[in-house]
Amino acid sequence: MSGIFRFSGDEDCLLGGSMYLSPGSCPGVYYPARKRLRVAATSFYSGFEEKQTSIDVLPEECLFEILRRLPSGQERSACACVSKHWLNLLSSISRSEVNESSVQDVEEGEGFLSRSLEGKKATDLRLAAIAVGTSSRGGLGKLQIRGSGFESKVTDVGLGAVAHGCPSLRIVSLWNLPAVSDLGLSEIARSCPMIEKLDLSRCPGITDSGLVAIAENCVNLSDLTIDSCSGVGNEGLRAIARRCVNLRSISIRSCPRIGDQGVAFLLAQAGSYLTKVKLQMLNVSGLSLAVIGHYGAAVTDLVLHGLQGVNEKGFWVMGNAKGLKKLKSLSVMSCRGMTDVGLEAVGNGCPDLKHVSLNKCLLVSGKGLVALAKSALSLESLKLEECHRINQFGLMGFLMNCGSKLKAFSLANCLGISDFNSESSLPSPSCSSLRSLSIRCCPGFGDASLAFLGKFCHQLQDVELCGLNGVTDAGVRELLQSNNVGLVKVNLSECINVSDNTVSAISVCHGRTLESLNLDGCKNITNASLVAVAKNCYSVNDLDISNTLVSDHGIKALASSPNHLNLQVLSIGGCSSITDKSKACIQKLGRTLLGLNIQRCGRISSSTVDTLLENLWRCDILY
């Protein structure tokens, strides 16, 4: 159908045939050149322009008045879907601006809803949608935003939308948001006074002003974390200490503008009610530790990591100040000031100390451990990692002098440990309270050391011996043969010299109580171990035989166990001898499985994997 458009641009056309012949319709006929129509392009195309929606013609003030009078949250959510403009306008309406005479559900919500945005999904637009959508559905109580660094699209506008629509907010986590500043945090503080937990990580735009706003408005704040916020300094901590009397836990990490003045003022002001203090990689000296030791009357958990400016005197004063009467847990990592003298002082000054963890404390030796054992009579667990000055004699001295309450001992990556001389006579006191023993990646630890521990520890339930090339069947047997109670968890991963004999002995002696057995990377483990487990173990529910020599026959032995194994987790990853022939047996075991690892099993085909995925739908399968 053809038509002639009027010059005015209206889309009216003459129906029917054309008034003129088309130049191409009659070949061979001469036509004079037509004159070009003097019609402007804008005039011609103006007829195709969409007319503006009538409601968009309204001034924004009028549209604001209309939207704030919507009678229900459901209608507000529906209107938010009309356009981004409407969504942004709705999200800018605070609860105080809503017309209460026409709204029935603007009462303060309970705040039980939780929302999390990560990476590219974290935008101002999504925050606006969350603010509008959750306001009528119980109220948002927890918000977690993980940005993507300088590519993050979350700004103060998005936080303002949340502040206006979510007054019931109690938990806020802002991570890696460089575009967020004090303006957005202040909006949250003023509009969400019920905040109890605040986590700020890698937000360089937030300074002391933002923390001051939090302190002035959020008096219920009980948990504060500040991590890698370069704009936050001592003044912000002072404001928190003055106003937030309900603060119970504080964690500060990698904030270069925070020093002794801020930390000391905080602990002096809030030490009587702060229970958890975590200081990591800060420019502080022994003064801060002295204040903690003097004023930290309520502190029960103390973490000190990477405090390079603290010397031995700082730890000595902290312990001898006698103020940490309630301290139960102490973790020290990469602090050059932690020495034998400091460790002894802490043990003497903290009578209720139960858990101690020392990591990369290179100046702590066996002398310090013995002093700790003699002074900290309530000690229940000790964890040592990369403390290379500790040797086997320090270990022996600690175990000989530790109190009757020690339940767990862990040693990892301590290169100063060497094996005892098998011909030397060793004392044989009892450490009957020890229930958990973990020795990991200590190259010098061998059979003689295990024999020594076997003389001390008769009540072990959880044994972890990992990456110990010097340990053989004889050493493990010496450790376990004097055990008076049944083992519950055994981890022998990466002990390449442990064989089927050890597994057989464990299954015979402790088969009725054993629940977890990890043999990952034990190169000498074969089907005989699985036969022993199937025959003697009744309660095992977690079995890891990854990277061993087991084959289809071993899996068949497990599936046909007379004890009807109730396995929940089975790991056979990296077992190249297991093939498709084990499919039926794995399916039989899968009746109770919740987790199955068949990664790097090269002889299990994709069709078998598909069958397992289809039939074991309750099980989480790694393939």
Swiss-Prot record:
Please give the record's induction comment: EIN3-dependent induction by ethylene.
Please tell me whether the keyword Repeat is annotated for this protein: yes
Q: Which Gene3D superfamilies match?
A: 1.20.1280.50, Ribonuclease Inhibitor
Could you tell me which residues the LRR repeats occupy? 119-147, 151-176, 177-202, 203-228, 229-254, 255-281, 307-334, 335-360, 361-386, 387-413, 414-441, 442-467, 468-494, 495-521, 522-547, 548-574, 575-600, 601-623
Q: Which GO terms describe its cellular component?
A: nucleus; SCF ubiquitin ligase complex
Tissue specificity comment: Ubiquitous.
One GO term (biological process)? protein ubiquitination
Q: Where in the cell is it found?
A: Nucleus
Keyword terms: Ethylene signaling pathway, Leucine-rich repeat, Nucleus, Repeat, Ubl conjugation pathway
Cite the F-box domain residue spans from the record: 52-106
User: Which SUPFAM superfamilies does this one have?
Assistant: F-box domain, RNI-like
The record, for InterPro entries, names: F-box-like_dom_sf, F-box_dom, Leu-rich_rpt, Leu-rich_rpt_Cys-con_subtyp, LRR_dom_sf
Identify the metabolic or biological route this protein is part of: Protein modification; protein ubiquitination
The task this protein performs is described as: Component of SCF(EBF1) E3 ubiquitin ligase complexes, which may mediate the ubiquitination and subsequent proteasomal degradation of target proteins (probably including EIN3 and EIL1). Regulator of the ethylene signaling cascade by modulating the stability of EIN3 and EIL1 proteins.
Quaternary structure per UniProt?
A: Part of a SCF (SKP1-cullin-F-box) protein ligase complex. Interacts with CUL1, SKP1A/ASK1, SKP1B/ASK2, EIN3, and EIL1.
**Under what name is this protein listed?**
EIN3-binding F-box protein 2
Q: Which gene encodes it?
A: EBF2
